[in-house]
Amino acid sequence: LVNYWLTFNEINMILHAPFMGAGLCFEEGENEEQVKYQAAHHELVASAIATKLAHEIDPNNKVGCMLAAGPNYPHTCAPRDVWAGLEEDRKNYFFIDVQARGEYPNYAKKEWERQGITVEMTEQDLQLLKDHTVDFISFSYYASRVASGDPAEREKTAGNIFASLKNPYLES
């Protein structure tokens, strides 16, 4: 009998490969970030509902979340590069925060406000997220990435789905 389950494989891929991660196609002129985060909200609520059902079906079931992971290292020790790495990590970790802690982190809400993104959510949605958090966190680790406060200055390298700045300390 299987007792360990994942609701969405690499749920954060919706931000990096929207069609592959959630089947999203954008209309011309559409606010793509708005659409991605609204779809992410629906996936997070669906995950909470699936977690609820899994626990009702068999109290021994353990349900987890799953992330395509890999830390973002700052390109230099310059504060803007350190901050850029943190911001890139937060874009991915926010999915874990919602699924494991049961609410949207303040840093995500503040970033949405800065970008003019308004995610429609009901009180019922928020209660489902709060009441049905995951039992464990899992991830696929593909590669580390490098972030800079000024990526235009830096040499980019491609790896899997994520593009990143070239890490000058690693051989390719």
Predicted regions and their residues:
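Active-site region of glycoside hydrolase catalytic domains
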Residues: L1-S172
